[in-house]
C-alpha cells in the first residue's frame, strides 16, 4: 500500500473499472489513485457520465474494480467475499442516496432500523437508537409515517438517520440535494456539516460546485480520470464536544448471539413477506389457488380412499370376515362338482373341534317360493347352522335367530331379511314375528328378522334362512352339504389357517376333492384395487399441485424483478446474500403454507358436501394426511421458491440500486 498515513481510511491504487458493451468494453474509470483521510469532508465533482458515481460505488463496496487495489482502514478488499463486503458496508459505511431509496412497506422508524437488524442489535437497542436519530433530525412527529406520507426533505432525513444507524465511520452521499428544494437542500448540507464536525468522514458526489465548496477537499473527475484534487483554503474546526448524532451510542452495546441474531433477521424477513403479500392480495391469492386446489384434492382423495376402505370393511363384516368357505370340486366352474358327495356334516363337526376355529356352519341352498295370503314371491332358501349368523356378522333386528336346538330338531323356524317385510306384508305394520308363511308347500314360522346381507350382487330375489337340517329333510331330501363356512379365530392368520384346514380335509377325504375360498384374499384384492385407484387420483391431484408450484416460481420471479431496487437497498445497508435468500424463500414458503392450510379446509369442505348429500361413502380425514399435506406444501415452497430467491441473493448491489 502506497499510503503510509496512519489516518488514511480509504486508499485506492491504480483503480480501473470497465463495463462490457457488446463485444467490447467501455472504460469508465482510468488509473484512479486516491487517499482519503479519516475525518475529511471530500466532494467528488464531475459532469454526468464522468465516472463519479462509479467511483462512489467502488468506495462504498457496492461494486468491484476491474483492476487495481483498494484498502479500507488497512484491509484490502480484492479477496473479500460477498458477505465480507456486506459486513464492511454494514459496519463502516452509511449511504445517503439522491432518490432516498426508502422501503414503502415500512415506516420511517422501520427504515432506519434495517441496518441494525442485519448488524444483530437487540430490538430495544435499535428502536431507541432509531427514535433518537429521527428526533435529532426533527422527525419526532413523523416516526410512524410511511415514505409516501413524507416530503422529499423528510425522506432524505430518514435516509440520513438510516446511514447513521450503525455508527458509520464513512458517510457516502450521492447527490444529497439533487432532488430537494433549496431550503431542504440547505438543511441536509447543515446536517452533513454537523456530522463532519463530529469527526466522521464525509464523501459527497455532486455536480454542483456550491455544494462542493462546503467540503475540505474537492476532487474533480472527467472522463474517468481525476483532473484536480484541491484542498479548501478555509480550514474548518472539528470538535467532538457535541455528539449530536450519537457517534458513541453503539460502542457499549453488545450485538445478539448468532442464534438470536438469526431469529431477528428471520422475523424481519417474515414480516416483510407478509407486507409484500398484503400489498398484492389478489395476485397472492391467485398464486395460492394452484396450491389450494392441489392440496385440497390430495386431502379429499386420501380421505375418500380411507372412507372407501372403511365401507368395504363394513360390507365384509356382513359377508363374514376372516372366514373360509369350503366347496366341492376344483373350482366354481368344475362340471364334476355336483357329483362330489364327500363334503358332509361330519366334516363340519370335525372342523369345529380345531383350536384355531371359532365357528363352523354347513350350508346348502334351494330355490322356491314364499307365500303369505295372496302374496307370493320367489326366494332362495339358505340352509345354515346356528353359527352361520355369527360367522357372517349378522344380528337380529327383530325376534331371535335359531339355535342349536332348532338345528337338532329340524325346526321350521324361519329368519327373513328386512327387505322381505315390504313384499310379504305390504299393508301391515304389525310385527311379523310368529306369523306362519309357506315356503314351497312347507308351513314355517317367522322367528326373526335381520338386515339384508351385502353380497355385492344385483339379484332382486329374496333370501330366507332355515336350519340346514330342515332344508335337507323338507326340501332336498339328502344329507349332502354343499358348502361349509369356517370362522377363523381373530388371532390366527387366515392364510395359515387355510393351509391347515386343507391338510386336515385331505387327510379325512383321502384326496383334495374340494377348494377353499378365503375371504381375506378377496378382501385384500379389493383393498389393493382401492389403494391403486386412490393413488392414481392422488397422483393427478399432485400434478395439479406441481403446476401450482410452478405458478409460485413464476410469481416469485416477477416479485424479484419488481423489488430489485429493495434488494439493492438492503444489500447497501449490510444484508448478506443469505439474508436476501432467506427473505424471498420465506415469502415463497409462506404462500405455499397458507395455500396448503386453505387447501386442507377446502378438502374438508368436500367431505361436508358428501354428508350434506348423504353419499353412501363418508370421507375420513387423518392427522397424518394433514401433516403430510402441510409438509408437502412447504417443500413445494422450498423447491419452487429457491431458484428465484437465489437469483435475488446473487444480484450485484450496484445493478440492483440502479433499477427502479
Swiss-Prot record:
SUPFAM superfamilies hit by this protein: P-loop containing nucleoside triphosphate hydrolases
ABC transporter domain location: 10-248
Domain of life: Bacteria
Alphabetically ordered keywords of this record: Antibiotic resistance, ATP-binding, Cell inner membrane, Cell membrane, Membrane, Nucleotide-binding, Translocase, Transmembrane, Transmembrane helix, Transport
Family: Belongs to the ABC transporter superfamily. Macrolide exporter (TC 3.A.1.122) family.
The protein's role, per its UniProt record: Non-canonical ABC transporter that contains transmembrane domains (TMD), which form a pore in the inner membrane, and an ATP-binding domain (NBD), which is responsible for energy generation. Confers resistance against macrolides.
Protein name: Macrolide export ATP-binding/permease protein MacB
Gene: macB
Amino acid at each position: 500500500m502506497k499510503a503510509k498515513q496512519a489516518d488514511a481510511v480509504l486508499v485506492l491504487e491504480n483503480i480501473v473499472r470497465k463495463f462490457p458493451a457488446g463485444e467490447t468494453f467501455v472504460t469508465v474509470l482510468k488509473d484512479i489513485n486516491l487517499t482519503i483521510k479519516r475525518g475529511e469532508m471530500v466532494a467528488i465533482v464531475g459532469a454526468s457520465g464522468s465516472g463519479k458515481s462509479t467511483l462512489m460505488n467502488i468506495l462504498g463496496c457496492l461494486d468491484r474494480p476491474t483492476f487495481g487495489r483498494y484498502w479500507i482502514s488497512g484491509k484490502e478488499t480484492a479477496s473479500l467475499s460477498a458477505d465480507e463486503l456486506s459486513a464492511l458496508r454494514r459496519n463502516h459505511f452509511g449511504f445517503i442516496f439522491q432518490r432516498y431509496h426508502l422501503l414503502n412497506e415500512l415506516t420511517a422508524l422501520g427504515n432506519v432500523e434495517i441496518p441494525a437488524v442485519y448488524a444483530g442489535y437487540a430490538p430495544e437497542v435499535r428502536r431507541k437508537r432509531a427514535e433518537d436519530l429521527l428526533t435529532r433530525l426533527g422527525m419526532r412527529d413523523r416516526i410512524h409515517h410511511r415514505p409516501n406520507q413524507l416530503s422529499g426533505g423528510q425522506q432524505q432525513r430518514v435516509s440520513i438517520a438510516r446511514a447513521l444507524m450503525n455508527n458509520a465511520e464513512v458517510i457516502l452521499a450521492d447527490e444529497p440535494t439533487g432532488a430537494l428544494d433549496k431550503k431542504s437542500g440547505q438543511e441536509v448540507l447543515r446536517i452533513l456539516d454537523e456530522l463532519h464536525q463530529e469527526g466522521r468522514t464525509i464523501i459527497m458526489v455532486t455536480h454542483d460546485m456550491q455544494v462542493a465548496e462546503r467540503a475540505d477537499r474537492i476532487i474533480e473527475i472527467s472522463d474517468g480520470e481525476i483532473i484536480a484534487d484541491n484542498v479548501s483554503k478555509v480550514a474548518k474546526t472539528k470538535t467532538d464536544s457535541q455528539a449530536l448524532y450519537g457517534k458513541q451510542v453503539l460502542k457499549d452495546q453488545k450485538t445478539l448471539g448468532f442464534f438470536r441474531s438469526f431469529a431477528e433477521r428471520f422475523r424481519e424477513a417474515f414480516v416483510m413477506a407478509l407486507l409484500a403479500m398484503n400489498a398484492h392480495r389478489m395476485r397472492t391469492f391467485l398464486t395460492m389457488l394452484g396450491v389450494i386446489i392441489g392440496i385440497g384434492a390430495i386431502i379429499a382423495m386420501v380421505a375418500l380412499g380411507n372412507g372407501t376402505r372403511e365401507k368395504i370393511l363394513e360390507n365384509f363384516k356382513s359377508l363374514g370376515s376372516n372366514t373360509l368357505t369350503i366347496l366341492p370340486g376344483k373350482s366354481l366352474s368344475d362340471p364334476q362338482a355336483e357329483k362330489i358327495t364327500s363334503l358332509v356334516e361330519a366334516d363340519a363337526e370335525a372342523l369345529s373341534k380345531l383350536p384355531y376355529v371359532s365357528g363352523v356352519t354347513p350350508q346348502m341352498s334351494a330355490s322356491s317360493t314364499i307365500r303369505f295370503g295372496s302374496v307370493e314371491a320367489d326366494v332362495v332358501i339358505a340352509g345354515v347352522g346356528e353359527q352361520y349368523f355369527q360367522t357372517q356378522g349378522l344380528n337380529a333386528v327383530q325376534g331371535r335367530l335359531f339355535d342349536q336346538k332348532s338345528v337338532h330338531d329340524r325346526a321350521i323356524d324361519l329368519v327373513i331379511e328386512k327387505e322381505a317385510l315390504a313384499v310379504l306384508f305390504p299393508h301391515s305394520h304389525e310385527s311379523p314375528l310368529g306369523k306362519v308363511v309357506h315356503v314351497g308347500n312347507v308351513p314355517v314360522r317367522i322367528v326373526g328378522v335381520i338386515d339384508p346381507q351385502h353380497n355385492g350382487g344385483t339379484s332382486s330375489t329374496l333370501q330366507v334362512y332355515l336350519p340346514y337340517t330342515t332344508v335337507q329333510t323338507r326340501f332336498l331330501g339328502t344329507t349332502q352339504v354343499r358348502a361349509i363356512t369356517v370362522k377363523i379365530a381373530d388371532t390366527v392368520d387366515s392364510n395359515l389357517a387355510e393351509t391347515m384346514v386343507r391338510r386336515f380335509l385331505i387327510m379325512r377325504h383321502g384326496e383334495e376333492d374340494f377348494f377353499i375360498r378365503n375371504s381375506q384374499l378377496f378382501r385384500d384384492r379389493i383393498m389393493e384395487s382401492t389403494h391403486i385407484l386412490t393413488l392414481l387420483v392422488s397422483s393427478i391431484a399432485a400434478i395439479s399441485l406441481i403446476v401450482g408450484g410452478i405458478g409460485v416460481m413464476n410469481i416469485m420471479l416477477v416479485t424479484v424483478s419488481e423489488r430489485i431496487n429493495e434488494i439493492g437497498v438492503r444489500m447497501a445497508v449490510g444484508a448478506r446474500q443469505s439474508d436476501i435468500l432467506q427473505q424471498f424463500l420465506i415469502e415463497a414458503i409462506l404462500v405455499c403454507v397458507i395455500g396448503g392450510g386453505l387447501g386442507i379446509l377446502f378438502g374438508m369442505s368436500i367431505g361436508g358436501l358428501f354428508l350434506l348429500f348423504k353419499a353412501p361413502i363418508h370421507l375420513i380425514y387423518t392427522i397424518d394426511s394433514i401433516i403430510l399435506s402441510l409438509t408437502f406444501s412447504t417443500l413445494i415452497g422450498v423447491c419452487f421458491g429457491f431458484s428465484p430467491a437465489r437469483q435475488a441473493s446473487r444480484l450485484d448491489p450496484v445493478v440492483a440500486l440502479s433499477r427502479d
